[in-house]
């Protein structure tokens, strides 16, 4: 019985212990939930404190703005002081006037003495002895007075000079000291502002991380609550027995909460006391701010208070981190205990005693943790009190530096005004020098180019005369050969010739004659061609030497201030990038049109060579094939060059877009890079337009051959060009039939229509280029505003906004001549003037460069219609006067080196070298095009990788080129994105006949006193 009773008692004891253990587990879970909720409440309280601190920071910023207004008032007082100083100077001038009056009195006294002497001389006979004595006395007195007056004048002048020298020395010393101190102070304040901004950003990042961690802790707490609810459902019976223990724990919690509330009340009272102290401090300083010197002290005090508040924020953030770490430790402990509970459920009953001991140890650890938290709060309150004492000491120390700041600011204003005046004067002087040098260089280049064009025209005239002489010799040779053949036939019929000569057939003899005559003609033509090549190469060498000896423009000295580093944060591309893209699309369409012309010229030549009789007209077919091959090689080379240039422009535009879409950098390198890249793109566009015009002219010159082959080429060219996609025609042309219009008139009318379209598009390009220049001027004006310098404002427009369809007609008919330059204003940007001259030069020479006139002055240009601009189809068809094509044709081959050589070198040296290399390469390309146009047989290229065909294998090479027209078109195709060009309204511009000179508009001078606490 004893063992049974002992077993029952043990079972009951085990059940009681098990219930007690479960109740303790539930109570422990409740305690952990309460601790988590208390930590969340503390976190909310800290967030409220942080919000209040932010509001205090905003209030401090408002106080700083009030201080800035007071500084402006100080500026007004400083101007009044300057006025008083000017009044003192006026008083000094009045004193000088009084000195002059004294001198006049002295002269009057001298005159009176002379009159007395004259009177004494009249009475000399009666009173000679007395008069001599009186005269000697008077003379001695006058001499003594004169010496005294001269001594006084000399002393006064010496004192004035000494005072002037001392004033100058004092001014220089004060200026030097002020500049050094201002630079030092500015550097220190900038470093402090950067540190403060970095600290604020780090605090914001830390707060975000803490918010994320708290959210994760809340989720974990929710999951723990769910698990605890399940445990409570299982252990409801054990809770009944442990209610007394729970009441004791609740009492302990109440005591702990009461103590926490007491500490919070103390903290709140300390904060209220701090606020009251701050209010009293602020009121005292507001009263002291009524005086001039003590108002600036509050500014420094607020700055230091702001720094200390940031330090307190750091301390509070560290406290929050510490609390989060404690919460994480508690959660980890809860998870460990939960795992231990799962293991202990499956363990033996003997381990319950050890679990009870573990619960007691955990309870003791929690109590120690709570005591540590209270101690840390007491320590925080003590640190806050110490920081308040430090703040008061710092405010007392910073009151001494305010007077020096005021003096330094006044001296800085004077120094800045003097520097601005000197800078404006230097800019005007350098601009005048650059304008004079540019005019001289442009005049020299124009005279040189006119001489070269005249020499080229003379060489062309000589070549035409030699061709006429060759034709006459050919006709004479043919007539002589026919007479000789007739004589030989008559001799053979009569039997007068010997037997060997009679056996020779007449056809073979005619073949020998025809074989001999072309060889001599070819030799003569080759000799003439070699002479022409030598002349052209000599002219090219002279041009390159002259372009190499052009002097660079004078450097412009200007001091750029530090602009706003966060200006221009918009990632959308500006208008001038869109205009560059529109010009790129125009050039791509030009390339496509030239490729279509090349393909249309290749196919007729191929058919004519295939259908020609091999035994009849050998010389004419070979000459036509050689000329066609030369034209194909020259056009292929030029098209490849244009493709490379278009690819380069694509790269430049993408680089500009990438730079604008990236994170905005400092404004100074952007100011230096963007105008230079825009200028480079402009130069490339001008060179491409010139080369397109020359290629168009070169393609329209048909090779001289038999009339039948030429008519066939024209017919097939018309048949091939019409289906190539001219979008502006409503009716598709057909092949000429019997009784229809001849193909030559159809081709001429078609070319006239295309020339009108090309002229209209070139004028639209010119308007877009002018808009781009205006945008660049606006950008420079904004840069000048950001630097705080007086910028030139454009003059009022003299003409009202006009219809964009009427602007091209006026620019064609009323534009100034090419050699005439517009007047330069002294306040205009030299880079703008250079680019404007270049754009006007290109805009006036480009519409006429596409015309190659015959004796009837028929236009023969060609340009494909753009598919992406249907809005331009309804514009007016502008008529280009045909009387003015000759002088423009003489001036269309100008090199782009001339406007580029006078560009002011505001950029680095490598940019100037790059621009000169681009100009020299464009010059070499133009000379190669001249050589290609003058030579009847193709000239081997040095830059491109086109294989050269030898003279005997020309027909085979020609066939190979004709067999594969599709790969050539693919090789010259330019890949790009289609963009719909948006129509832009042309801004109102002043008329070119009366250009309005811009004047300097005196803008409102911004405040020179910088607030170092406010971020830029």
From Swiss-Prot:
Residues 14-607, 676-700, 748-775 form a coiled coil. Residues 846-859, 934-945 have a biased composition (Polar residues). It comes from the Eukaryota. Residues 500-519, 549-573, 781-921, 933-1016 are annotated as: Disordered. One of its GO terms (cellular component) is centriolar satellite. It is found in: Cytoplasm, Cytoskeleton, Microtubule organizing center, Centrosome; Cytoplasm, Cytoskeleton, Microtubule organizing center, Centrosome, Centriolar satellite; Cytoplasm, Cytoskeleton, Microtubule organizing center, Centrosome, Centriole; Cytoplasm, Cytoskeleton, Spindle. Residues 1-503 are annotated as: Centrosomal targeting domain. Residues 604-1016 are annotated as: Microtubule binding domain. GO terms for biological process: centriole replication; cilium assembly; G2/M transition of mitotic cell cycle; microtubule nucleation; positive regulation of mitotic cell cycle. Pleiotropic regulator of centriole duplication, mitosis, and ciliogenesis. Critical interface between centrosome and microtubule-mediated cellular processes. Centriole duplication protein required for recruitment of CEP63, CEP152, and PLK4 to the centrosome. Independent of its centrosomal targeting, localizes to and interacts with microtubules and regulates microtubule nucleation, stability, and mitotic progression. Interacts with CEP63; the interaction is required for their location to proximal end of centrioles. Interacts with microtubules. This is Coiled-coil domain-containing protein 57.
């Amino acid at each position: 019985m004893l063992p049974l009773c002992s077993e029952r008692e043990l079972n009951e004891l085990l059940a009681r212990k098990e219930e007690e253990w479960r109740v303790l587990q539930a109570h422990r879970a409740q305690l952990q939930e309460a601790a988590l909720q208390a930590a969340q409440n503390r976190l909310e309280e800290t967030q409220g404190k942080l919000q209040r601190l932010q509001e205090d920071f905003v209030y401090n910023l408002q106080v700083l703005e009030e201080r800035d207004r007071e500084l402006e008032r100080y500026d007004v007082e400083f101007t009044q002081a300057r006025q008083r100083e000017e009044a003192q100077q006026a008083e000094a001038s009045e004193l000088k006037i009084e000195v002059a009056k004294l001198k006049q009195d002295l002269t009057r006294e001298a005159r009176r003495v002379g009159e007395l002497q004259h009177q004494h001389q009249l009475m000399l006979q009666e009173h000679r002895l007395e008069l001599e004595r009186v005269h000697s006395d008077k003379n001695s007195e006058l001499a003594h007075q004169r010496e005294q007056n001269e001594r006084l004048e000399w002393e006064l002048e010496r004192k004035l000079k000494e005072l002037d020298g001392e004033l100058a020395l004092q001014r220089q010393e004060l200026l030097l000291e002020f500049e050094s101190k201002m630079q030092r102070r500015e550097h220190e304040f900038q470093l402090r502002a950067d540190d403060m901004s970095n600290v604020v950003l780090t605090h914001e990042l830390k707060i975000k991380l803490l918010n994320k961690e708290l959210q994760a802790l809340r989720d974990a707490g929710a999951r723990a609550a769910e698990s605890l609810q399940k445990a409570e459902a299982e252990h409801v019976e054990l809770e009944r027995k442990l209610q007394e223990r729970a009441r004791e724990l609740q009492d302990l919690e109440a005591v702990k909460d009461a103590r926490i509330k007491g500490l919070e009340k103390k903290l709140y009272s300390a904060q209220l006391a701090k606020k009251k102290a701050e209010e009293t401090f602020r009121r005292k300083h507001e009263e002291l701010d009524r005086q001039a010197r003590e108002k600036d002290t509050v500014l420094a005090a607020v700055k230091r208070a702001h720094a200390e508040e940031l330090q307190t924020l750091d301390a509070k953030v560290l406290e929050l981190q510490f609390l989060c770490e404690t919460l994480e430790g508690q959660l980890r402990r809860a998870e460990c205990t939960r795992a231990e509970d799962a293991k202990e459920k499956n363990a033996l009953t003997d381990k319950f005693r050890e679990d009870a001991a573990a619960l007691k140890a955990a309870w003791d650890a929690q109590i120690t943790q709570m005591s540590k938290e209270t101690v840390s709060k007491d320590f925080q309150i003590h640190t806050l009190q110490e920081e308040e004492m430090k703040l008061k000491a710092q405010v007392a120390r910073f009151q001494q530096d305010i007077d020096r700041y005021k003096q330094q600011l006044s001296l800085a204003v004077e120094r800045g005004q003097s520097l601005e005046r000197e800078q404006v004067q230097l800019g005007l002087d350098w601009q005048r020098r650059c304008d004079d040098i540019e005019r001289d260089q442009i005049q020299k280049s124009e005279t040189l180019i006119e001489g070269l064009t005249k020499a080229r025209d003379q060489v062309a005239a000589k070549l035409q005369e030699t061709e006429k002489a060759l034709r006459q010799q050919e006709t004479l040779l043919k007539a002589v050969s026919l007479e000789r053949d007739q004589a030989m036939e008559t001799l053979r019929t009569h039997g007068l010739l010997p037997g060997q000569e009679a056996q020779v057939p007449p056809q073979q003899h005619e073949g020998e004659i025809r074989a001999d005559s072309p060889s001599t003609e070819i030799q003569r033509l080759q000799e003439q061609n070699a002479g022409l090549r030598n002349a052209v190469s000599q002219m090219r060498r002279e041009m390159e030497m002259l372009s190499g000896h052009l002097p660079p423009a004078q450097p412009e000295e200007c001091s750029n201030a530090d602009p706003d580093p966060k200006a221009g944060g918009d990632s959308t591309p500006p208008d001038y990038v869109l205009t560059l893209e529109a010009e790129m699309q125009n050039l791509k369409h030009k390339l496509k049109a030239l490729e279509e012309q090349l393909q249309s010229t290749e196919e007729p030549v191929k058919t004519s060579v295939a259908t020609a009789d091999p035994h009849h007209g050998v010389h004419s077919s070979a000459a036509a094939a050689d000329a066609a091959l030369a034209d194909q090689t020259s056009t292929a080379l030029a098209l490849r060059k244009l493709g490379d240039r278009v690819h380069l422009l694509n790269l430049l535009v993408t680089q500009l877009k990438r730079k604008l879409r990236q994170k905005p950098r400092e404004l100074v390198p952007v100011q230096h890079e963007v105008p230079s890249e825009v200028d480079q793109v402009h130069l490339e566009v001008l060179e491409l337009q010139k080369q397109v015009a020359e290629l168009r002219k070169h393609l329209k010159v048909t090779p001289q051959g038999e009339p039948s082959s030429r008519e066939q080429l024209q017919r097939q060219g018309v048949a091939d060009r019409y289906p190539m996609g001219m979008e502006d025609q409503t009716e598709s042309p057909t092949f000429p039939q019997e009784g229809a219009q001849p193909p030559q008139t159809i081709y001429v009318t078609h070319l006239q229509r295309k020339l009108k379209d090309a002229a209209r598009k070139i004028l639209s390009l010119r308007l877009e280029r002018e808009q781009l220049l205006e945008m660049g001027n606006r950008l420079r004006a904004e840069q000048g505003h950001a630097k705080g310098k007086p910028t030139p404002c454009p003059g009022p427009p003299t003409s009202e906004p006009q219809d964009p369809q009427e602007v091209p007609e006026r620019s064609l008919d009323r534009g100034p001549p090419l050699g005439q330059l517009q007047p330069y204003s002294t306040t205009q940007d030299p880079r703008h003037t250079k680019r404007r001259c270049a754009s006007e030069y290109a805009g006036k020479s480009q519409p006429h460069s596409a015309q190659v006139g015959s004796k009837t002055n028929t236009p023969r240009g060609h340009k494909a219609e753009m598919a992406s601009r249907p809005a331009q189809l309804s514009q007016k068809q502008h008529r280009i006067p045909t009387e003015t094509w000759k002088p423009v044709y003489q001036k269309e081959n100008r090199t782009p080196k001339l406007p580029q050589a006078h560009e002011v070198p505001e950029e680095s040296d490598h940019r100037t070298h790059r621009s000169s290399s681009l100009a020299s390469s464009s010059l070499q390309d133009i000379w190669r095009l001249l050589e290609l146009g003058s030579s009847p047989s193709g000239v081997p290229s040095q830059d491109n990788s086109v294989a050269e065909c030898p003279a005997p294998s020309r027909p085979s090479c020609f066939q190979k080129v004709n067999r594969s027209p599709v790969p050539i078109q693919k090789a010259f195709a330019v890949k790009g994105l289609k963009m719909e060009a948006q129509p832009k309204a042309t801004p109102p511009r002043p008329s070119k006949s009366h250009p309005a000179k811009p004047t300097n508009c005196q803008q409102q001078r911004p405040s020179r006193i910088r607030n170092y606490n406010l971020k830029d």
